[in-house]
Design a protein with these regions (language model features):
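ATP-dependent adenylation/nucleotidyltransferase module used to activate substrates
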Residues: 1-200, 244
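ATP/NTP-dependent adenylation/nucleotidyl-transfer catalytic domains that generate, transfer
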Residues: 2-3, 70, 75-78, 91-108, ...
């Protein structure tokens, strides 16, 4: 395995799928996750769980080696106190509804991708110099992000990468890899299904180790252990915030049940209930667009 990549791994569905994509394409991957004070920091635990699962399943197959994934969580201590966003601790409530609605702009974290990309660029350039070969900067940004998050748009990514090239010697050894830039979450999930098949991975086990929810819910759960009833706390995804709506829509289109557990303020809910709720949001959004034409 010769190709190198540094991946921004949030623990969400998009970057987790891109990790599978890179492995299936023969990359050796260094994953960087960022703790910037996000409310939904369960995503960092999911990232760790996924990397652990993938490393346990690395092997030779058809003369290709799926190498162990390197992973590091970078803590940006104190950054949340400087940021105005519903996604960070101390910010406003995370809005609910369709992911294309204007109120979703409250979930923008100022300059987030620029902050992350600067660190990722530095790591990629260092790897390229150490190994004497080119290194990709991989990000799972996609078309569904463009209307809400300006730092996910092609023009920003191009300008940011140009600034990196201008500011560093040897930058020609690094290239930008954003295969989902023109696709949506459904396209990403389809690619994830393909990669799981290629890598002989269990799709449900992989995607159970991802978090897309901006409003995860911690609930007490009880299970039997022999004759005893054991109490535990587990994280559930919400199904009303925009990020969750977009994820559920992708699973509906793919015709698969989402393996993550969903809940609301009243407790756990079934996948059928989640599908029905999200379908109604999507229908209402389309009806509103038609009315406004």
């Amino acid at each position: 395995m010769n190709k190198q990549a540094v991946l921004s791994l949030s623990g969400g569905m998009d970057s987790s799928t891109l990790l599978l994509h890179l492995l299936a394409d023969g990359y050796e991957v260094t994953c960087l996750s960022f703790d910037y004070g996000q409310k939904h920091n369960i995503e960092l635990q999911r990232a760790k769980e996924l990397v652990k699962y993938l490393n346990a399943h690395s092997r030779y197959e058809d003369e290709q080696y799926y190498a162990k994934v390197k992973h590091q969580v970078i803590t940006l201590k104190g950054l949340d106190k400087l940021l105005n966003s519903a996604l960070v601790k101390g910010g406003d409530d995370v809005p609910e509804g369709h992911y294309a609605e204007d109120n979703m702009k409250a979930t923008v974290v100022p300059n987030r991708n620029k902050i992350f990309s600067s660190i990722i660029q530095a790591a990629a350039l260092s790897i390229a110099e150490q190994k004497g070969k080119s290194c990709a900067i991989a990000m799972g940004i996609h078309a569904g992000d463009h209307s809400v998050y300006p730092d996910c748009r092609q023009e920003f990514r191009d300008a940011d990468f140009e600034a990196f090239k201008l500011g560093n010697w040897g930058s020609e050894k690094v290239y930008l890899y954003t295969p989902y830039l023109l696709g949506d979450k459904f396209d990403i999930l389809k690619d994830g299904e393909r990669c799981c098949t290629f890598l002989h991975l269990n799709f449900d086990k992989v995607y159970a180790k991802t978090n897309t929810s901006y409003k995860p819910i911690k609930l007490k759960v009880y299970y039997n252990e022999g004759e005893d009833t054991v109490e535990s706390e587990e994280w559930f995804s919400d199904y009303k915030s925009a990020s969750s709506v977009e994820r559920v829509e992708a699973f509906i289109k793919l015709g698969r049940k989402d393996p993550v557990q969903y809940a609301d303020e009243f407790g756990p809910v079934t996948w059928e209930y989640v599908k029905e709720f999200v379908s109604s949001i999507l229908e209402n959004y389309e009806d509103a667009k038609t009315t406004n034409i």
